[in-house]
């Protein structure tokens, strides 16, 4: 009887880490073990890096290439909601007549998790600095990306912006 209790306790102690391992992010820009990166997760990570690169180049059209060009796209930035790619595009074009005002984004951390073979969840933490001031804006974004014939595209996202 005592042996059975010891075995039960050992099993309970060993099982939670196995469950936790399956729920880990496949890509984390601060990885504990980079050898576990999966190809699709890496593709999503690279899409996000390309998006940030285009922002820093002040290339709005290039930045928006990673979003699904569809009226079904949903983007929420704080309390402002954009329905469809065209509305998002127009908002960026009109909101940044001086592209330098976009500032420069620096990713702090990017995590990617495949939910299905063609669906991924990404979390990013970032800061934006502005050349005209010494202020820095910080925030985070949650994005759902779907795999299409032409690659991974953001189909929904939510961004929260912190103080400056």
PLM regions and their residue ranges:
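Hydrophobic pocket/interface hotspot
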Residues: 51, 63-64, 72-73, 88, ...
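Short beta-strand edge/turn micro-motifs at domain boundaries
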Residues: 21-29, 138-164
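Short, low-complexity N-terminal intrinsically disordered segments enriched in polar/charged residues
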Residues: 21-66
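Sec-dependent N-terminal signal peptides
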Residues: 5-14
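Sec/Tat signal peptide C-region and signal peptidase I cleavage site
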Residues: 16-20
């Amino acid at each position: 009887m005592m042996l059975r209790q010891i075995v039960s306790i050992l099993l309970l102690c060993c099982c939670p880490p196995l469950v936790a391992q399956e729920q880990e992010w496949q890509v984390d820009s601060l990885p504990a073990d980079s050898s576990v990166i999966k190809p699709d997760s890496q593709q999503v990570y690279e899409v996000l890096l390309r998006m940030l690169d285009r922002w820093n180049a002040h290339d709005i059209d290039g930045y928006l290439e990673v979003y699904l060009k569809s009226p079904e796209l949903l983007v929420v930035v704080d309390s402002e909601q954009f329905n469809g790619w065209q509305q998002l595009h127009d908002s960026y074009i009109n909101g940044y007549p001086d592209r330098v005002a976009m500032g420069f984004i620096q990713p702090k951390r990017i995590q990617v998790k495949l939910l299905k073979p063609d669906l991924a969840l990404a979390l990013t933490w970032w800061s934006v600095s502005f050349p005209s001031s010494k202020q820095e804006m910080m925030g985070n974004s949650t994005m759902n990306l779907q795999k299409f014939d032409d690659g991974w595209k953001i189909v929904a996202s939510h961004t929260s912006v912190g103080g400056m």
